[in-house]
Amino acid sequence: HPSDTYYIIGSTVGPHPYPDMVARLQSVISEEIKKQLLEKEGRDHPDYLIACVGGGSNAAGTIYHYIDDERVKIVLAEAGGKGIDSGMSAATIHLGHLGIIHGSKTLLMQNED
């Protein structure tokens, strides 16, 4: 019921502490990267990390344990869909407009509805 519940989106958006909670929960991604690299390569860090930045949870989890590691180059990519001028794009950083989602002011892809 809206008067006693709150929907928490699974993205790194909204007021604190929700983005931090999502990032910490998704940090299992970078834990697994460290574990597999150590097993297969004998080191726990990659040269590069590449992640998509849609809602942010995948990227946050991927870089979580490497964010302060200067040995790792981090590359974040935004989905372009069929191009920014196609009308079929999810390029929020490029095409988004300020809006409110879950009490947080951020860039959004939205229409009048």
What are these regions (language model features)?
Residues 1-3:
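PLP-dependent aminotransferase-class I/II
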Residues 5-7, 15-113:
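Glycine-rich phosphate/pyrophosphate-binding loop at beta-loop-alpha junctions
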